[in-house]
């Protein structure tokens, strides 16, 4: 009432009587909330039958920051699914049958970096080291298989070796924008 009127006179501006911008719940806000919910429900290969509703699908070998990157993208309003790539057989049939169903991007990394990350993961979980999971030769094979799979389906790839989640997401958004232009 009087306080708003006083400020209005002091600032020589008419009061709008609307909540400030930081509290406005607009379409953008609801879009982000929907994207976050979608992304959480489609993390780590879940609900693949709904994969066609994704704006972006991330595929990658274990420990390539698929989940944190997906969550970051969701906070920007992109409905993101992520699928672990164990081998080509782990790709959902719907994606193999229609590889351009939406913007699909492969995430890859250097094998030695993956060994280090996986060993740290095993240590942090206090699990005995799974030699298959942390073996350099096995990981080299896994990374090469992933690269070949991405190439086979003509999916763009991003090497996440020395990239932060934010940098990876920025690259993904650029690819997505190009994809939408060509769509």
Segments the model singles out, each with a brief description of its role:
Residues 81-83, 103-107, 156-158:
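Hydrophobic/aromatic beta-strand patches that form the interior of the parallel beta-sheet core
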Residues 1-32, 113-117:
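Long, charge-dense
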Residues 103-141:
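A glycine- and Lys/Arg-enriched "phosphate-lid" helix/loop adjacent to the NTP-binding pocket
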Residues 80-91:
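Short beta-strand-centered segment that lines the nucleotide-binding/catalytic pocket of NTP-utilizing
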Residues 149-183:
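NTP-dependent small-molecule kinase module
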Residues 33-80:
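Internal active-site segments that recognize and position negatively charged phosphoryl groups
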Residues 87-89, 110-114, 164-165:
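Conserved nucleotide-binding/hydrolysis micro-motifs of P-loop NTPases
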